[in-house]
C-alpha cells in the first residue's frame, strides 16, 4: 500500500498550493479565499522513484458555523487516515492560536505518526529565519518552505521519504470499477456517497455546491472493488463565475473522463431539466456507461403508476439516449442504494463485453433477414460481414460495398438490435461502415 501523506493546517496557509507543487499539476482548487478547499482530496504522486498518496484537506478552523465545523471534522478524519502528516503554517502570519491548538492535538493524539512542521511562504532569507519561531508549537524542527516558488520543498520530501517503508510491495492489480457521481449542484450526490459508505466522507449541507472538488473513495461490494468519484456538479456555463466554480465544473468533466460508468443524479422534485440532459449527453459523448439515478424519490407524492409515468416522461426527453437505465432512489432512506451499484457493475461489464465474430455474423444474418436495407438512390447496400473492433466501449465494424448508402434509420435499427441481442444496456455503441 502506498503511504498516505496528509496536508493539515488552518485555512489559507497554502495547503492546496503545496499539494499542486508536490504533484506538479493543478489538482486542487487554489484561491486566496480562506476555506476554498473544504473537503479531502486525494491524488497519487511520486518522488525519487517512490510512490505515495497525497491528501489535501479543508483548513483547521475551530469556529461556529456549518461549513467550518464540518471542515474541522474532515481534518480530524484526514489525520486519522494518514500515515504521515505535514502540518503547514504561514510564516507571514506568525504563530496563531489555531496553530497552537492543532499542534497540541497532533502531539497529544497522533504522536505515533511522523509529523513534519512546514512553515510556508518563506520566500526570502529573512522569512526563512523567522520560521524558527514556530518551535513554540512544540515541534523542534520547522521546515522553511515556499509552496509558491518551490524552495525547500525538495528537502522536505527527501526527509519524508526516509519514513517510508523499505518497499512499496508488489504492484497491485487495480480491478476497481471507476464510477463518477455527477449531476447538477445539490441533487444529493454527497448524501448518496455517505449513505453508501456509512461514513461522512463528504461535507454535506443544504448549501448548493458544498462539494467543490472531486473526491475519490474506494469501497468493496460482493468482492468487487469500486472507485467512487463524487463531484461538485456541472453548473450551467452562464452561472459559473470566473474562478472557483468554473474550475470545479471543469474538474467534474475531467471526472467523467476518468470513469467507466457515470452515475447521473437527478432531483425527483423539479423533474428533468435542460442541464440534466446536457450532463447525460456529455457522459454519452465521452462513450462512458451511464446510469440515471432519480434521487429524493421519498419527497414525491405517488401512487402505483407514478414511477412508470415519470420514467416515460424522462425517456421522452432523452431521445436517442433512451437505452440508459433509470433507478429511483432516496439517499435519505437508502432505497435502491445497492441496486444502483449492482446495475453500475452490469453496465461496466456491458461496456467491456467482447463478442465473437461468429456470433456477430449470425446476428447480422438474422438482422438482414428481418430488415433488408433500402436506399434513396435505388442502389443496393450489401453488407458482407461484421466484427468487433478493440476499444474501451463496444465498437462494431460493418464491411459493405458502399458506406454512403447506409441510412440513419437502418443504422439505428442495427444499434437497437445489437443492444437487444447482446445485453448492451447503458452503454454507447459505435457502428462503423467500411468499404470492402
From Swiss-Prot:
Residues reported to bind GTP 1: 9-16, 56-60, 120-123
Keyword Heme set for record: no
Isomerase in keyword set: no
UniProt keyword list: GTP-binding, Nucleotide-binding, Repeat, Ribosome biogenesis
Binding annotation for GTP 2: 183-190, 230-234, 295-298
InterPro entries, per database record: G_ENGA, GTP-bd, GTPase_Der, KH_dom-like, KH_dom-like_a/b, P-loop_NTPase, Small_GTP-bd
GO molecular function: GTP binding; ribosome binding
Domain KH-like: 353-436
Pfam families linked: KH_dom-like, MMR_HSR1
Gene Ontology BP terms: ribosome biogenesis
Superkingdom per UniProt: Bacteria
Entry function: GTPase that plays an essential role in the late steps of ribosome biogenesis.
HAMAP family (alphabetical): GTPase_Der (MF_00195)
PANTHER family assigned to the protein according to its UniProt record, in alphabetical order: GTPASE DER
Family recorded in the similarity comment: Belongs to the TRAFAC class TrmE-Era-EngA-EngB-Septin-like GTPase superfamily. EngA (Der) GTPase family.
Quaternary structure annotation from Swiss-Prot or TrEMBL: Associates with the 50S ribosomal subunit.
Protein name, UniProt field: GTPase Der
Originating organism: Chlorobium luteolum (strain DSM 273 / BCRC 81028 / 2530)
Amino acid at each position: 500500500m502506498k503511504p498516505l501523506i496528509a496536508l493539515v493546517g488552518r485555512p489559507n496557509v497554502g495547503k492546496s498550493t503545496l499539494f499542486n507543487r508536490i504533484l506538479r499539476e493543478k489538482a486542487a482548487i487554489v484561491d486566496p479565499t480562506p476555506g476554498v478547499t473544504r473537503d479531502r482530496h486525494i491524488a497519487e504522486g511520486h518522488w525519487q522513484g517512490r510512490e505515495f498518496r497525497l491528501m489535501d484537506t479543508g483548513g483547521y478552523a475551530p469556529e461556529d458555523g456549518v461549513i467550518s465545523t464540518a471542515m474541522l471534522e474532515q481534518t480530524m478524519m484526514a489525520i486519522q487516515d494518514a500515515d504521515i502528516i505535514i502540518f503547514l503554517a504561514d510564516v507571514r502570519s506568525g504563530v496563531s492560536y489555531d496553530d497552537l491548538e492543532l499542534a497540541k492535538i497532533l502531539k497529544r493524539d497522533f504522536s505515533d505518526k511522523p509529523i513534519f512542521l512546514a512553515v510556508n511562504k518563506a520566500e526570502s532569507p529573512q522569512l526563512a529565519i523567522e520560521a524558527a519561531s514556530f518551535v513554540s508549537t512544540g515541534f523542534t524542527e520547522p521546515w522553511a518552505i515556499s509552496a509558491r516558488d518551490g524552495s525547500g520543498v525538495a528537502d522536505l520530501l527527501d526527509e519524508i521519504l526516509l519514513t517510508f517503508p523499505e518497499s512499496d510491495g508488489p504492484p497491485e492489480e487495480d480491478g476497481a470499477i471507476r464510477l463518477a457521481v455527477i449531476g447538477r449542484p445539490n441533487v444529493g450526490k454527497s448524501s448518496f456517497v455517505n449513505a453508501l459508505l456509512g461514513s461522512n466522507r463528504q461535507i454535506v449541507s443544504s448549501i448548493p455546491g458544498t462539494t467543490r472538488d472531486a473526491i475519490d473513495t474506494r469501497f468493496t461490494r460482493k468482492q468487487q472493488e469500486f472507485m467512487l468519484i463524487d463531484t461538485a456538479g456541472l453548473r450551467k456555463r452562464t452561472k459559473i463565475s470566473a474562478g472557483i466554480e468554473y474550475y470545479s465544473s471543469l474538474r467534474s468533466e475531467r471526472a467523467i473522463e476518468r470513469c467507466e460508468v457515470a452515475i447521473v443524479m437527478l432531483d425527483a422534485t423539479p423533474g428533468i431539466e435542460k442541464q440534466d440532459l446536457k450532463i447525460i449527453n456529455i457522459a454519452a459523448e465521452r462513450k462512458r456507461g451511464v446510469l440515471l439515478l432519480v434521487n429524493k424519490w421519498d419527497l414525491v407524492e405517488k401512487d402505483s403508476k407514478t414511477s412508470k409515468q415519470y420514467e416515460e416522461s424522462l425517456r421522452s426527453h432523452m431521445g436517442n439516449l433512451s437505452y440508459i437505465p433509470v433507478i429511483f432512489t432516496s439517499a435519505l432512506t437508502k432505497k435502491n442504494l445497492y441496486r444502483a451499484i449492482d446495475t453500475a457493475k452490469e453496465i461496466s461489464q456491458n461496456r467491456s463485453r467482447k463478442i465473437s465474430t461468429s456470433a456477430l455474423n449470425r446476428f447480422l444474418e438474422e438482422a438482414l433477414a428481418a430488415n433488408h436495407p433500402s436506399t434513396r438512390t435505388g442502389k443496393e447496400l450489401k453488407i458482407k460481414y461484421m466484427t468487433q473492433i478493440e476499444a474501451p466501449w463496444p465498437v462494431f465494424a460493418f464491411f459493405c460495398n458502399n458506406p454512403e448508402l447506409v441510412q440513419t434509420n437502418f443504422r439505428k435499427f442495427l444499434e437497437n438490435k445489437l443492444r437487444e441481442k447482446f445485453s448492451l444496456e447503458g452503454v454507447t455503441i459505435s457502428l462503423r461502415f467500411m468499404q470492402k
